[in-house]
C-alpha cells in the first residue's frame, strides 16, 4: 500500500494521485508543537526527499551540514535544491495578445457541479498535468518540488523530482537552433558563465504545457506558444542560497517580455526520490471526482 506525502500545493490531485514509489517509507509527525506536516523517512543510510522534510528537519539538516557560513564555489551549482519552487509573478504579467487571450480562455476549468467552483487540479480541470502530460519548463521549476543540478565537463543537467524529468543545459559553446527541428517539453538549452552568474537561454518548447497555474483565480493556466524563449540568470549567493531571474519572451502570447525572480534553498540532508504521474491512478482519481 502506498503512503501519501503531504505537500503544500493547493491541487488536491497532487496529494492523492502522484504518490511516492518507496512503499517502505513511513510517516513521522513533526516534534514541534503545531507542526503537523510529517516527514517521510527513507531508512538507514538513505536521505529523505526535499518535499518530505518538515521545517524542523530542514533546520536540523542546515545545522548538521553547517550550511550557514560554509565555504562555496559561486560557479558550482551542484546540489539538491527546493522544494520551494518560485511562483511566476502574475501581478506583473503584461497584457496578452488576442491569440494569447484565446489560449488563456481555453484553459478555463469546467463547472462540473454547481455547488463547487471550477478549479484546475480539481473537477473539470483543463490542466495538462491531470492527464499525466509532462510539466515542461519552466513549470517543473515553478512547481513545488525539488531539483538537482549536476555539473559535467560539457553540460549542466537539471533533474526534477516530479515525474523523473531532466533537462540538459549545454555548455560546450553550441548555439540555440534558429528553428527547432522538433519541439521539446523542456526545450533546447545552452548555458554560459558571466562572472559568477550562470546564464541559460532556451527555445523550441512544446506549447501544450503551461507556464504555471494562474494563481489569480486557480481556474485557468498561464499559456505560452512554441515561439517562447527563456533567459535565466542563476547566481549562488551563499553555500545554501540560489537566486534566479527568469525572463519570458513570447511575443505571440504576451505583448512584452516579463521577468520574475525567486530564491531556492539548498537541501543538504535530502536526495531526489520518485514521484510519478501514473495514468491508471490519475484516471481513477478523475473518475472519483465526479461521482
Please describe what each predicted stretch is:
Residues 7-18:
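Bacterial N-terminal signal peptides
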Amino acid at each position: 500500500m502506498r503512503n501519501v506525502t503531504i505537500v503544500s500545493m493547493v491541487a488536491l490531485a497532487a496529494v492523492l494521485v502522484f504518490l511516492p514509489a518507496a512503499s517502505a517509507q513511513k510517516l513521522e509527525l513533526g516534534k514541534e508543537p503545531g507542526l503537523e506536516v510529517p516527514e517521510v523517512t527513507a531508512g538507514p543510510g538513505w536521505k529523505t526527499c526535499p518535499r518530505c522534510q518538515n521545517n524542523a528537519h530542514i533546520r536540523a539538516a542546515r545545522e548538521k551540514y553547517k550550511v550557514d557560513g560554509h565555504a562555496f564555489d559561486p560557479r558550482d551549482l551542484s546540489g539538491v535544491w527546493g522544494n520551494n519552487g518560485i511562483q511566476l509573478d502574475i501581478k506583473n504579467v503584461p497584457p496578452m495578445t488576442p491569440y494569447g487571450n484565446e489560449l488563456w480562455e481555453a484553459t478555463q476549468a469546467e463547472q462540473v457541479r454547481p455547488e463547487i467552483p471550477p478549479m484546475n487540479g480539481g473537477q473539470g480541470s483543463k490542466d495538462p498535468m491531470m492527464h499525466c502530460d509532462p510539466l515542461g519548463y519552466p513549470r517543473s521549476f515553478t512547481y513545488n518540488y525539488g531539483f538537482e543540478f549536476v555539473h559535467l565537463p560539457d553540460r549542466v543537467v537539471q533533474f526534477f523530482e516530479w515525474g523523473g524529468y531532466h533537462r540538459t543545459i549545454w555548455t560546450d559553446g553550441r548555439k540555440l537552433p534558429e528553428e527547432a527541428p522538433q519541439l521539446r517539453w523542456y526545450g533546447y538549452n545552452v548555458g554560459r558563465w558571466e562572472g559568477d552568474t550562470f546564464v541559460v537561454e532556451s527555445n523550441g518548447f512544446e506549447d501544450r504545457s503551461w507556464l504555471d497555474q494562474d494563481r489569480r483565480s486557480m481556474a485557468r493556466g498561464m499559456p505560452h506558444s512554441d515561439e517562447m524563449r527563456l533567459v535565466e540568470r542563476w547566481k549562488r549567493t551563499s553555500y545554501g542560497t540560489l537566486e534566479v531571474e527568469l525572463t519570458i519572451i513570447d511575443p505571440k502570447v504576451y505583448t512584452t517580455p516579463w521577468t520574475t525572480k525567486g530564491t531556492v534553498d539548498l537541501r543538504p540532508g535530502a536526495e531526489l526520490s520518485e514521484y510519478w504521474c501514473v495514468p491508471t491512478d490519475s484516471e481513477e482519481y478523475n473518475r472519483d471526482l465526479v461521482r
